[in-house]
């Protein structure tokens, strides 16, 4: 990104790597200089908690508030009843109103850790406020006439689904109209002039901008973040044990800490910029470390991210537990080392095959039973998928395999 921003917020977005695209960088920059801007990100309530994949955009809202602006977290109490079809191969299962409300309550706990809510602070809204009471015929006449079906079919999120000859229901097709209407209502009710989101939401964001300009002649903007993957191509938000939840009741602070401690060397500097508030220069310095020194940077990363979500005490406790496990009979010299050849990985190796071939379990059948009963952990993360692929990235400098509470092995590449 070569644009030289004048506003603090856009400077942070560019310098730390949050920015993928913006509908009008110069106009947004000028507005941010002139005074506080209100912006929102929408979250459909499809699960009981947010996960690490949502954290990038949550940090964007946090920086937005820290640079003197007003963020809105928009809960999709209305749109969740329809379901976002973007880049999905099949229709989302429909949730009951009670389940949607339950999920929203769980998500609110996460946002409260990152944003300051109040009369002059961040706002938490629910689009059911205006969507639930819509009159369908009035909506078609007043709003639907502004949308071109030809243009909607050209958006990549829809086009990719149709190109694969996968069904797209009329219910789902309406989602992008409802999301666009959210922006119009947020501008009309709260003066919101910026929508942010992942780059997969670009089409939905542009729809909202076009609608609001047509109906209210408003100058508003959209800004997207990159869809983040790890250096080895894995999608953020997942670990060997499944989703990395931002709810302590669904994933313990210790397991959350371990997720960040196990970051691949090549990702440390980038993740420090995106998920912590350390100065950029310090992030670059830590990310440039190598060998055993990079492990200290990973601990700093884990502590900083865990502190933001769960608090400093939880981060300190997680680090202390990790030291006890790894240094006093965990992943240090006291563990029996199992060496795995690179050839063993070449043809593909599942975690079941790893356990059986290295003798950690007596057979593949025993390994499957162990996983089904929740008795296997890799680097202290529970594993539930017997088909989990074991590769060089997962093994890294050493993969701690725990069977039950007392049997531990260290798998290394020979």
UniProtKB/Swiss-Prot annotation:
<keyword id="KW-0067">ATP-binding</keyword>
<dbReference type="InterPro" id="IPR002305">
    <property type="entry name" value="aa-tRNA-synth_Ic"/>
</dbReference>
<keyword id="KW-0030">Aminoacyl-tRNA synthetase</keyword>
<keyword id="KW-0963">Cytoplasm</keyword>
<feature type="binding site">
    <location>
        <position position="238"/>
    </location>
    <ligand>
        <name>ATP</name>
    </ligand>
</feature>
<comment type="similarity">
    <text>Belongs to the class-I aminoacyl-tRNA synthetase family. TyrS type 1 subfamily.</text>
</comment>
<dbReference type="InterPro" id="IPR024107">
    <property type="entry name" value="Tyr-tRNA-ligase_bac_1"/>
</dbReference>
<keyword id="KW-0436">Ligase</keyword>
<feature type="binding site">
    <location>
        <position position="40"/>
    </location>
    <ligand>
        <name>L-tyrosine</name>
    </ligand>
</feature>
<dbReference type="InterPro" id="IPR002307">
    <property type="entry name" value="Tyr-tRNA-ligase"/>
</dbReference>
<dbReference type="GO" id="GO:0004831">
    <property type="term" value="F:tyrosine-tRNA ligase activity"/>
</dbReference>
<comment type="function">
    <text>Catalyzes the attachment of tyrosine to tRNA(Tyr) in a two-step reaction: tyrosine is first activated by ATP to form Tyr-AMP and then transferred to the acceptor end of tRNA(Tyr).</text>
</comment>
<dbReference type="GO" id="GO:0003723">
    <property type="term" value="F:RNA binding"/>
</dbReference>
<keyword id="KW-0547">Nucleotide-binding</keyword>
<dbReference type="InterPro" id="IPR024088">
    <property type="entry name" value="Tyr-tRNA-ligase_bac-type"/>
</dbReference>
<keyword id="KW-0648">Protein biosynthesis</keyword>
<dbReference type="InterPro" id="IPR014729">
    <property type="entry name" value="Rossmann-like_a/b/a_fold"/>
</dbReference>
<dbReference type="Pfam" id="PF00579">
    <property type="entry name" value="tRNA-synt_1b"/>
</dbReference>
<dbReference type="InterPro" id="IPR036986">
    <property type="entry name" value="S4_RNA-bd_sf"/>
</dbReference>
<dbReference type="GO" id="GO:0005524">
    <property type="term" value="F:ATP binding"/>
</dbReference>
<feature type="short sequence motif" description="'KMSKS' region">
    <location>
        <begin position="235"/>
        <end position="239"/>
    </location>
</feature>
<dbReference type="GO" id="GO:0005829">
    <property type="term" value="C:cytosol"/>
</dbReference>
<feature type="domain" description="S4 RNA-binding">
    <location>
        <begin position="349"/>
        <end position="414"/>
    </location>
</feature>
<keyword id="KW-0694">RNA-binding</keyword>
<protein>
    <recommendedName>
        <fullName>Tyrosine--tRNA ligase</fullName>
        <ecNumber>6.1.1.1</ecNumber>
    </recommendedName>
</protein>
<dbReference type="GO" id="GO:0006437">
    <property type="term" value="P:tyrosyl-tRNA aminoacylation"/>
</dbReference>
<feature type="binding site">
    <location>
        <position position="175"/>
    </location>
    <ligand>
        <name>L-tyrosine</name>
    </ligand>
</feature>
<feature type="short sequence motif" description="'HIGH' region">
    <location>
        <begin position="45"/>
        <end position="54"/>
    </location>
</feature>
<comment type="subunit">
    <text>Homodimer.</text>
</comment>
<feature type="binding site">
    <location>
        <position position="179"/>
    </location>
    <ligand>
        <name>L-tyrosine</name>
    </ligand>
</feature>
């Amino acid at each position: 990104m070569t644009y030289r921003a004048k506003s603090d917020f856009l400077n942070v977005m560019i310098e730390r790597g949050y920015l993928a695209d913006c509908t009008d960088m110069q106009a947004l920059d000028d507005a941010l200089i002139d005074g506080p801007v209100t912006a929102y990100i929408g979250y459909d309530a499809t699960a009981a908690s947010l996960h690490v994949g949502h954290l990038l955009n949550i940090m964007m809202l946090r920086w937005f508030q820290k640079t003197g602006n007003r963020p809105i977290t928009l809960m999709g109490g209305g749109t969740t009843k329809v379901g976002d079809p973007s880049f999905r191969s099949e229709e989302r299962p429909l949730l009951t109103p009670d389940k949607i409300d339950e999920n929203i309550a769980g998500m609110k706990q996460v946002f409260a850790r990152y944003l300051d809510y109040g009369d002059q602070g961040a706002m938490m809204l629910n689009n059911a406020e205006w969507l639930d009471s819509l009159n369908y015929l009035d909506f078609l006449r007043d709003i639907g006439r502004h949308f071109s079906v030809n243009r909607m079919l050209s958006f990549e999120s829809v086009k990719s689904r149709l190109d694969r000859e996968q069904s797209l229901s009329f219910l789902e097709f309406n989602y992008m109209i409802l999301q666009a209407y959210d922006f119009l209502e947020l501008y009309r009710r709260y003066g919101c002039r910026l929508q942010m989101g992942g780059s997969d939401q670009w089409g939905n964001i542009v729809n909202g901008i076009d609608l609001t300009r047509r109906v209210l002649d408003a100058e508003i903007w959209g800004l997207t973040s990159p869809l983040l993957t790890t250096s080895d191509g894995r999608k953020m938000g997942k670990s060997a044990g499944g989703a990395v939840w931002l709810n302590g009741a669904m994933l313990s602070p210790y397991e959350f800490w371990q997720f960040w401690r196990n970051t691949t060397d090549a990702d440390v500097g980038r993740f420090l910029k995106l998920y912590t508030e350390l100065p950029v220069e310090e992030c670059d310095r830590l990310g440039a470390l190598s060998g055993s020194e990079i492990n200290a940077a990973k601990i700093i990363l884990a502590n900083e991210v865990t502190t933001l979500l769960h608090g400093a005490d939880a981060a300190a406790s997680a680090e202390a537990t990790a030291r006890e496990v790894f240094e006093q009979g965990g992943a240090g010299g006291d563990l029996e080392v199992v060496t795995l050849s690179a050839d063993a990985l070449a043809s593909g190796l599942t975690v079941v095959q790893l356990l059986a071939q290295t003798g950690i379990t007596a057979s593949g059948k025993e390994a499957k039973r162990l996983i089904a009963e929740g008795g296997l952990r890799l680097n202290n993360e529970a594993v539930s998928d017997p088909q989990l692929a074991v590769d060089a990235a997962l093994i890294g400098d050493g993969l701690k395999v725990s069977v039950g509470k007392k049997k531990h092995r260290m798998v290394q590449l020979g």
